Every structure is written in C-alpha cells, then in structure tokens.
Amino acid sequence: MSSPAELSASELPMDSTLTGPVLIIGSGLLGASIGLGLRAAGCEDVYVQDISPTAEAVAQDIGAGTSFSTLSEQERTAFAPQLVVVAAPPDSAGAVCARALNTYAPRPEAGYPGAVVTDVASVKVQPLADVLASGADASRYVGSHPMAGREKSGPVAARGELFQARPWIICEHDSVRPECVRLVRSVAVELGAIVTSLNVEEHDQTVALISHVPQAMSSLLASRLQDTPLYALSLAGQGLRDTVRIAASDPTLWVQIFAANADPIVQTLYGVRDDLNRLIATLENPTASGARLDLAQLMSEGNAGVSRIPGKHGTAPAAFAKMTVLVDDTPGTLARLLAEIGELGANLEDLRLEHSTGAPVGMAEISVNPSIHEALVRDLSARGWRVVK
C-alpha cells in the first residue's frame, strides 16, 4: 500500500462527511449565518476571515467562528481546512475561490488532500469561468447558491436558521470530484436546506427570472414613489408594500449581481418589455375594438403564471378559503387569536398581516381549508372577534 507521500494529489482520499476545519471567507450575512448554523450543528472547528477586521471581529463575537486573524503566522501557514466557503461578492467570488484552491492545495507529504472550495454567490457562470481561467485545481471547486437572505446585511443580521427549508442549489461541472460535491451537499443538508442540482447556465437563467428581474421590477416601481405626495403614500395598502418590499435591498450588492448576470436578465426583460408595450398600446386607446379582450388576456396570462408556482411543501397550488380578522394593535392580541384558532382545531394554511392606515388596528388575513371556513368564521365571531369573510 502506498504511503500518503507516495500518492499524487488526485489520489489522496477526501472525506465527504464534514469534520472540519471550515474556513469561511467573508463574514457578512451569508458567511456568518453559515458559521452559526454549522456550530449549532456541532461543528466547532469553524474560522471566519474578512477583509474588514470589524466584520470579522463581529462574526466571532456572535459565535459564527474563530477569527482567522487571531491565529499565529505559524498556525496560519500550517492551516489545513477540509472546506472553504467563499461568501464574497459576485464580482470577486471566482478570484477568491481560485486563491483558496491554491493556498489550500494538497500536501501529499502530510496526507492533506487539499480543501474543497465552494462559493455562495448568487451567480454561477462567472465564478466557474474565473476559476477555470486561473489554472487552479477546479476538481475541488463546487459552486453553490443558498436561496436565502434578508433585506438586512452584515454579520449582525446573521441567523443560524437562515437556510432552514430553503433551496440550496449545487452546480456541478465536468472536472469536479464527486466526493467534493457530496461534501458540499452534506453541509447544505446539515444547515436544513433543500438541495437542488443545476448546471451553471441553468442556474443563472433560473435566478434571472425568479430573483433578479423581480428585484429590478420592484426597484423600478419603488422609484416612482420618490415624488409621490405623502397623502397618496399614506393610502398605500399591502399590494404596493408587497411589490416594493425587496426594493429596500443593498444597491451595492445588486449592482454586482445585475452586471454578473446581465445577459439572462436582459433576455427576460425583453419579454417583459414586449408585454409592457402591448399594455401601453392597449391603454392608449382603451375603447378600441378588442382592447378589453387584450387586457383580459394579459391578466389571464398573469393568472396562469402564478398558478404554476408550487404551493405549500412544494405541492400543487391549492385553493384556500380566506377570511380577515380585525386585530387591535395591543400586546398579545395576535397571539391570542392564533391560540384560539388552535383551540378550535383549525390549521392555518397561510397568514398575512396588514396595518390599517390611521387606526390602531391590524387586519389578519387567514387562509384555511374551505371545508372549515364557515365553521371557523362562526366560532371566532362567537368568541368576540370581528371577522370579515
């Protein structure tokens, strides 16, 4: 049997079960959340590294990992991570991955097979291209993308449960070693994510439609509000708030995402532009023959698209019955409503909250199975709740 020193780098065995150490490069929202999640899952050997000493220190303070800069020069030189997670911006993720692949390359004399390197950037074509162009050992690189986030950024916004029940896309490529893919997959599963596999082109086309274009549309609509009179904004309901919610996202990050995934985004926007031009042309002459039919068709096409989005637990969309319960804006009132619904044996399929403009009351829109709708309305009303069907 060959000794580790006699084996080539590609022959050194790699463990597809996470044991650590793990190095997280980039201690923002995603990086720090991964650190918190791994440590909560029992992997204590986690280190965080960031170009910002403050961000790195905060990540350590919240428990996301040990600050890499606290290691001595000798310890850093000998450092041999099993996994490196690159949580860098999209425009630099590939270059950082390439550096990590070279820095933590195999050391056959020590039996070290080298680090598996993954990134969590929201685009995947460019990082892979950058790694391949660098000449680094791409067999240990696995692109991945956890589809989770918040409007807030930075390590202070990190949550260990951020990835629970959220999709995590893993992008294999032709030269990657299967055991490296298995390791990254096991990490995603350990963090509670639901793993999906796509190639890098499929990934970028998909996220252009389901994430990047929605961000663009939300920002474009929200920009119309800049000169809107305050009296008009005070009347805004949940429809506008839902549509512009993600417009509060970090502009610096999204500039990088748009630039890195420009072509798939543009291809989707061409279709949106065609439909928008069609709508404008119809509304410019709304009494013309066929105008109302065209408007109805546009709306129906939207209905058809929405109906294809999976429902609860990934199943086919279900038609739920809805009711609205008026809830006083006082401590404990909403909790009492939910507790009483539970006491009545009803299962909530969905819950949406909306605040009433100018009144200390909220509206809880409750979705339930149609078979219990009438009984729940009756029972809640009997308990003194103000229910609107």
Region spans (language model):
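Internal alpha-helical scaffold of NAD(P)-dependent oxidoreductase catalytic cores
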Residues: 162-248
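Rossmann-like NAD(P)(H) cofactor-binding subdomain of soluble oxidoreductases
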Residues: 101-156
